[in-house]
C-alpha cells in the first residue's frame, strides 16, 4: 500500500469516496482538505464513454474558461510581417519565424506554454513535430492554434483558454483554477469545460458519455462530483 504524507492522510479521512458531491460541496471540501501551503491548482478528471483507440472517438479541443486558470501562460507565435506585428500588439511573449524554429531545434528552447502559428508557417513549424508533439505544444487547427486570426488566438490564451485531449484510458485531465478561487468561480469554470466536452461528443460514441467527474487540488485527494448536478 502506498505511503501518504501525514497531511494527505488526514485529508483522505474527510473525503467519503462513496459519495457523489454536488459541485459546490465538492469545491468547498477540496479547499478544506488541500494539504499544501502554496496556492494549489484545481484539476478535474472527466471519464468519458469513448474508446480512444478509434480515430472517430477522439475528443480534443479548447475552451476559454470564464475565470481563467489563475496561471499566466507564455505564448509563442510563429508569424511574419503584419501577422507578427498583430501578435506582438495582442500580447504574445515571443514572435518569430525561422529564428524561433532554429532556437528550438538547436538550443532545445521550450520557454513557452502555448505555440500559435499562421497556416502558411506550418511547413516550417512541422519540422518541430518530434520536439513539440510529445509535449503537447504543436500548433493544431482543432485547438484554434493554427489560424490567421492571431490577435484573437493570443488574447484567448491570455484570458484563460485551455486545451483538452482524451488520454488512452478515456479520461480528460484539465486545470480549472486555483484553490484561492471562490467556489462560484470554480463551479462556473467546471460547467464551462463540461459543456464544451458535451459539444465535442463524437458521433461514434455509444452509451453513457459522461461516466464520471472528480476534482482535486495538486496535492490533495480526488473528490467525486455528481455529473447530473454539473449539467443541470
UniProtKB/Swiss-Prot annotation:
Gene3D superfamilies: 3.30.190.20, 3.40.50.790. GO terms for molecular function: rRNA binding; structural constituent of ribosome; tRNA binding. One of its GO terms (biological process) is translation. Keywords: Repressor, Ribonucleoprotein, Ribosomal protein, RNA-binding, rRNA-binding, Translation regulation, tRNA-binding. GO terms for cellular component: large ribosomal subunit. Part of the 50S ribosomal subunit. Belongs to the universal ribosomal protein uL1 family. Binds directly to 23S rRNA. The L1 stalk is quite mobile in the ribosome, and is involved in E site tRNA release. Protein L1 is also a translational repressor protein, it controls the translation of the L11 operon by binding to its mRNA. NCBIfam families: rplA_bact. This is Large ribosomal subunit protein uL1. The lineage of its organism: Bacteria, Bacillati, Bacillota, Clostridia, Eubacteriales. The gene is rplA.
